Amino acid sequence: MKKKQKFIAPIYGLKKTPKQSIKLDKSILIRAVDLLTEEHKYLEKFGLKGSYDAVLEVNYEYDSDNPSEPFPGLFINLINKIDASLVVYGDGVVGVAGVAPAPKEEFSGGGILSSSARPRYEEKLDKEIDENFASYYKKFVIAYDMRPVAFDVYRRSCDRFSNNDRTIDSCTVLESLFVPLGERSKKSFILNGLNILMFSTDEIKTIDDIVEYRNAIIHADRKRQLKLLTGSKYTYKWFEDVFKLIRRILYKYVDNPWS
């Protein structure tokens, strides 16, 4: 049986509260947390205790006879996509903290905490959420539907700490974007894809280097890893710059997707 349910999902990592409500589509709205109704205290009942500046308001339609609805279906069908759109939109620690039924909604399933991130001010998203985000989101949905693995792997990778783990994730993202299924010459397709997106020679060389480092990891070539890491290139800052470059590649793909 078809059923509609309203949920709210707080967003962490915004430097500013949205000045006005932003409609992403007919069923999704981003708005400020309602302080008059003490919405922040309501969210705390579901373990969502962060200092949030905005929430997603979602009118979710689902089949109540399906055991995977509304959870985890809501995440698989919608929340993960919006979460990915936020982390690709700009540099910073940002995302959807969890989901709770909207106040006064009749729902017995409770809520879900998906992230307990508490970014410092300087770590927060370097862009405002406004009408520009709404325009970007429309394009993002098209790109996400074409390359869901690339965006979901990047989204999950943002919560990881090991440079080796994030390096493997980054190369998985690039392969998902640029390499045809079953193709073995992966690096050449990746570098050619970056050329098509008009990245600079230096940026393409950086991706070449991270692919080489990933190859040393997955082939358990410890000698090669140590040789690379003892040089002057593979510093903490270098890895951080590479991971930011991966985000920019995804952002540019949103502007210019191809199948």
Can you say where each PLM-predicted feature lies in the sequence?
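Short amphipathic alpha-helical segments that mediate assembly, nucleic-acid/protein binding
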Residues: 72, 133, 187-191, 203, ...
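Residue-level recognition of hydrophobic positions within alpha-helical transmembrane segments
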Residues: 79, 165, 171, 210-211
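Flexible secondary-structure boundary motifs
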Residues: 166-204
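Glycine- and acidic
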Residues: 154-158, 195-197, 227-232
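A glycine-rich, aromatic-flanked flexible loop/lid motif
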Residues: 143-144, 183-187, 214-215, 222
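Charged, non-catalytic interaction/linker regions at domain boundaries
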Residues: 1-165, 243-244, 249-253, 257
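Charge-enriched, short contiguous segments at helix-coil
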Residues: 107-117, 128, 167, 201-209, ...
